Amino acid sequence: MTRDHFRSAQMFAEAQKYMPGGVNSPVRAFKAVGGDPIFFLRGEGALLFDVDGNRYIDYVASWGPLILGHAHPLVVRAVKECAEFGTSFGAPNELEIELARLLVEALPSVEMVRLVNSGTEATMSALRLARAYTKREKIVKFEGCYHGHADALLVKAGSGALTLGVPTSPGVPEDTARNTVVAGFNDLEGLKELFARLGEEIAAVIVEPVPANMGLVLPRPGFLKGLRDLTAAYGALLVFDEVITGFRLSYGGAQNLYGVQPDLTCLGKIIGGGLPVGAYGGRRDIMEQVAPSGPVYQAGTLSGNPLAMAAGISTIKALAEPGVYEALESKTLRLARGLEEAAARAGAEVYITQTGSMLCVFFQPGPVTDFAGALRSDTARYSRYFQALLERGVYIAPAQFEALFLSTAHTDEHIDRTLEACEEAFRFAFSG
């Protein structure tokens, strides 16, 4: 059954001459699962095709943006038509207005929005704005929540549950990390203790409302509302990082699904339809502090570039059609339940989480409610599972602690074939 990956291996060897590790984002190097990364040639719907001619059912979806699948005709047409008029102007264009309007209309908490080029830019800019607005310096983040690679957010917990952050990457100054406080996700009581101690110094709490970078961890009932109430009581801002969940869990995002309105929202991925994009937005009185309306500086050469705007507009309009999210939820539930049954038949001890069109298979009995729980997963078994699926034509995240994504392009046939492959992969992963 071994597939030929000769051209991919050649390309990886060549890539390592010119790029650190041969990739432009670390997870792509397959370090967490072993072997060499696959080089892809094209995508079509729910399928990916590599440079060696192998075909895969794709559940990575470019790490989430491709909710309509690869090369969706509406998105491709929009980008082609836009490119005929130019790829970038470095000046205002009408498409910026249209995308901004769609975002404001979809998210009740967002009255104004600033478009940027990535999720990292969005979170970095939102936290600068929060600090300026509140005139405070400390930021609270949660263990296991990823908010991009800005220095202030590349921190981990220290020796205690409620400690100041310490750098998790060389090159991050300790002085920068000291203003980031790390708390446990889903631990509202612990957060209350933290605010009792530091509340007057905290500018903002930033959170993935549904974390998708420690696997997929669901918020406990009342946790998000508790964050809203606590931050409001202390005059801190609540920032939802919806770079992944925005327009993924519902039309708008997790805040629409859970009925909790943050002060600021960070977006990315889906709102660019597969092109580089980010955005941050929120209450008018806060957003009017951003230059040139106010003193908080943020800028970008390619911010609001027409190609990303066109791709995002066409994607969001397609998602606004009746029944789209219901259909996505239905097929994802079918896959999740099928995986549970396949694992049981194979004697595989796994714990599956699912919401909307996202899911995760933790290689442990569960439950998983926080970062510490996620870390109990058997990453060696996950690696065997990943490699077995790759050989059977199913492409999932090359790391245990990532979510899987479905798209409107996935069919019942794709799911049936996936479940058949997964049962075999479970047997292989738990055979040794």
Curated annotation (Swiss-Prot):
One of its GO terms (molecular function) is transaminase activity. Its EC number is 5.4.3.8. The modification N6-(pyridoxal phosphate)lysine is found at K269. It is found in: Cytoplasm. GO terms for biological process: protoporphyrinogen IX biosynthetic process. Pathway: Porphyrin-containing compound metabolism; protoporphyrin-IX biosynthesis; 5-aminolevulinate from L-glutamyl-tRNA(Glu): step 2/2. It catalyses: (S)-4-amino-5-oxopentanoate = 5-aminolevulinate. It holds the Pfam family Aminotran_3. It comes from the Bacteria. Its cofactor is pyridoxal 5'-phosphate. Keywords: Cytoplasm, Isomerase, Porphyrin biosynthesis, Pyridoxal phosphate. One of its GO terms (cellular component) is cytoplasm. Gene3D superfamilies: Aspartate Aminotransferase, domain 1 (3.90.1150.10), Type I PLP-dependent aspartate aminotransferase-like (Major domain) (3.40.640.10). SUPFAM superfamilies: PLP-dependent transferases (SSF53383). InterPro entries: 4pyrrol_synth_GluAld_NH2Trfase (IPR004639), Aminotrans_3 (IPR005814), Aminotrans_3_PPA_site (IPR049704), PyrdxlP-dep_Trfase (IPR015424), PyrdxlP-dep_Trfase_major (IPR015421), PyrdxlP-dep_Trfase_small (IPR015422). PROSITE patterns: AA_TRANSFER_CLASS_3. It is an enzyme of class 5 (isomerase). Belongs to the class-III pyridoxal-phosphate-dependent aminotransferase family. HemL subfamily. NCBIfam families: hemL, PRK00062.1. HAMAP family: HemL_aminotrans_3. This is Glutamate-1-semialdehyde 2,1-aminomutase. It comes from Desulforudis audaxviator (strain MP104C). The gene is hemL.
